[in-house]
Amino acid sequence: MASKDDAGTSNVVTRFAPSPTGYLHLGGARTALFNWLFARHYGGKALLRIEDTDKKRSTQDAIDKILEGLDWLGLDYDDTPLFQSERGSRHVEVAEKLLEYGYAYRCYATQEELEQMRAAQRAAKQPQRYDGRWRHRDASEAPAGSPFVVRLKTAEDGETTIEDKVQGRVTVRNEELDDYILLRADGSPTYMLAVVVDDHDMGVTHVIRGDDHLNNAFRQLPIYHAMDTIEGGWPEPVYAHVPLIHGQDGAKLSKRHGAVGVEAYRDEMGVLPEALFNYLLRLGWGHGDQEEFTREQAIELFTLEGVGKSASRFDTKKLLNLNGHHIREADNARLAALVAAKIGPAADEALLTQAMEVLKVRAKDINELAEGAAFLFSKRPLEMTEKAEKLLDGEGRERLAKVSEALSAENDWTIEALEATTKALAERLELGLGKLAQPMRAALTGTTTSPGIFDVLVLLGREESLARIDAQATPAEEGANG
């Protein structure tokens, strides 16, 4: 049976189909990204389906977080999201057609019978799967009014082969596939049926998902084949099963590796969306040795041929290094707004924007930017770190008094003028510039790390800079008014 048009043609349709039972985790975000990029690369459609049939576990909060996370990453979707729970009647319609044409059957086996079957299989060390006991029996053999499920009639011999765009050719013996349930005893459709019907009705041409779904593909294909025989127009999609993301220890990424939702990388870790976009792109896909990609480059270059067969390892350090690069490339006003949100009401966005060029040089995340900018809004007396306190010994305070005197006489409060004045003072005192700059930094910021000391002086302004220096240059017993 022919599959839909292969990669490289027009009319590509992909879908991202999360279950709203939790946050949008990294694996899901990467699947969404790969589907979106593939569709955009070929000028096709990227669709979104919310698989919310598990009403006990699906929540509106999870749906909101998924949509918010996708929007934050810049993954826009064509058409409105499709909610699987609203399509139950369509799923049942297909199951009934499969029943009508002999591709499915009613199974009246009781739970007790199925438990006995599994126990016997365990005892015989056989694979545990349904044994087809109602496949060739007539419904009249069941007691009147007995509950039943509807099962798919899968091939009993031969093989099924999938030409997967990532895994290559994969073949299974049909005897390994059981007659799985399409409709439960309460008449509700199962995931396996709903996925196929929805993919068909949405016109999905390429199913790109984690390789933990590879076995599902072999179970889903018979529905395509049967429905194509019954009514035509049910070509199977092209499959691409992407290896999962692992932690640094090689195990599947999980909460113990720090795996959290996309919103945590934004809100708690201070990662920019373009950095996570770039990092997820490189988790399992490559284009030569290139590490950094703009959104436009990613769309232009992304193909399934670039997806590797082996699992990729998530590395927080690499993500933050990449994030640092994107911070340095980012617009200062945008960064200032993000930092202001971290600092709170005391923040001055205009001052932060002015400071951002020097603040962002070393920062790897928005949290570090906020920490680096905190000195701008500190109230006197400044709280000192232990290392800063050590620089403000008697000798350091004496030098600050001389710095204050020299800077007070400087009318041109610019980086160049302040640097010249301070260097002249250091030469006069026969000191290296660092011997003055270190206690100055401690007095001005309360820390031993900051942007260049002359940048700090300009950002704080003349009045505040001299007030902070004087507060530390004055002996403690006289400094209560500082």
From Swiss-Prot:
GO biological process: glutamyl-tRNA aminoacylation
Entries under SUPFAM superfamilies matching the protein: An anticodon-binding domain of class I aminoacyl-tRNA synthetases, Nucleotidylyl transferase
Predominant location category: cytoplasm
Keywords associated with the record: Aminoacyl-tRNA synthetase, ATP-binding, Cytoplasm, Ligase, Nucleotide-binding, Protein biosynthesis
EC number: 6.1.1.17
Protein residues bound to ATP: K255
Ranges spanned by the short sequence motif 'KMSKS' region, renumbered to the chain: 252-256
One GO CC annotation: cytosol
Sequence motif 'HIGH' region, location on chain: 18-28
Record bears the keyword Cytoplasm: yes
GO molecular function: ATP binding; glutamate-tRNA ligase activity; tRNA binding; zinc ion binding
Family matches, as InterPro entries: aa-tRNA-synth_I_cd-bd, aa-tRNA-synth_I_codon-bd_sub2, aa-tRNA-synth_I_CS, aa_tRNA-synth_I_cd-bd_sf, Glu-tRNA-ligase_bac/mito, Glu/Gln-tRNA-synth, Glu/Gln-tRNA-synth_Ib_cat-dom, GluQ/Sye
Keyword Glycoprotein: no
Location(s), subcellular: Cytoplasm
Highest taxon of source: Bacteria
Reaction(s) catalysed (UniProt annotation): tRNA(Glu) + L-glutamate + ATP = L-glutamyl-tRNA(Glu) + AMP + diphosphate
Subunit structure: Monomer.
Protein family (similarity comment): Belongs to the class-I aminoacyl-tRNA synthetase family. Glutamate--tRNA ligase type 1 subfamily.
Functional description taken from the UniProt entry: Catalyzes the attachment of glutamate to tRNA(Glu) in a two-step reaction: glutamate is first activated by ATP to form Glu-AMP and then transferred to the acceptor end of tRNA(Glu).
Name of the protein described by the UniProt record: Glutamate--tRNA ligase 1
Organism: Erythrobacter litoralis (strain HTCC2594)
